[in-house]
Amino acid sequence: MLAGCQPSDTSILERGASVREQIRGVNAGTTDTIDCDEPIRSQADWELLRGVKQIRSFTLREGIAGDREASIIGSLTSLERLSLRHSPLGDDGFREIASLQALVALNIPQADCTERGLESLSSLPHLQSLRLGSSRLDGLRACEILATFPALKSLHLIDIHIKDQGLLSLSECKKLRSLYLDNAGVSQEAWGEYIIRQPLVHVHIDQAHHDRDPIKNHPSAVESK
């Protein structure tokens, strides 16, 4: 049994409950959340998750999920919030995640996907919040794909070099209200043009507000956990 997984509601399960205990809680209807602060390394523990219908929020704070585990995550059809830290999902894994049609928020800061994997997420009708990092993404093409996401309101890109043209492509995201970029390689001139095109978007660059951000006190919807 794996220790170190804890639910958000400690009145239901004691802090430090194992992933198996949390799954039992979900199946019993006492919680809809699984929150693990240590890696799930046992394939047997992963298999216990397959097809569990009542999970709405699943968080791995220390990983580790790859493409094989993504096939199990993709079977959690009620999932609305998914956070996979230290999890190098590739394109196959992203295609599995794209089957989660109820997904609203996705956080995969250490992914290993290309544009093909990212494009598969454009089919998610309710995805409002995305936090993503992958060294394999072409920045401009990634932004062109993100501009097609139908419901995206909050976006955080980590170490993806979108440069000026990528930022201007993101101005086509008409529903976007919060944009966080870390190490994006964008010039001040491009930021000026973006703010003219998208005056309602809260802008945060390299962990700081842009000095021309028109909405400095906007509460970001992007998960940073």
Residue ranges of predicted features:
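C-terminal motif of bacterial Sec signal peptides marking the signal peptidase cleavage site
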Residues: L2-G4
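Concave beta-strand-loop units of leucine-rich repeat
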Residues: D9, E14-L48, K53-I72, S78-I145, ...
